[in-house]
Amino acid sequence: MQNSKIEASRNVAITGQGCFYSTILAGKEFKIPNGVVRGGEVIVNEGNIIAKEFGGPTGISTTARIVKNGRITANLVHPNVGVAIGEQSYRFSETTSMVKVFLQGGILTVYSGSNKIHG
């Protein structure tokens, strides 16, 4: 999917290789377990965002945002990728693997594997 906009009241699942320079708005969940989100943004009202990879090695601006509550998970996140849950956000400055983002005690918490890197 390239240069597109998708809006759904429930779940969005992408089975192809990736989303490039696109905007995805989902009510409950966004999944692209075997692909990349490179450029653009994914916004979920309440639920999870799951991707194999966010951003790209050149630092293309990419955003994953959950409006209310949920988790963001990715195998790989590149620099200049922003993640947010509610009003709290974090921007990656280096390539990071095994990423989990969630609210813990109301604080945005970011893990790389078992290492806490924010929160």
Task: Name every feature range the model reports, one short phrase each.
Residues 2-119:
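Intrinsically disordered, low-complexity terminal regions
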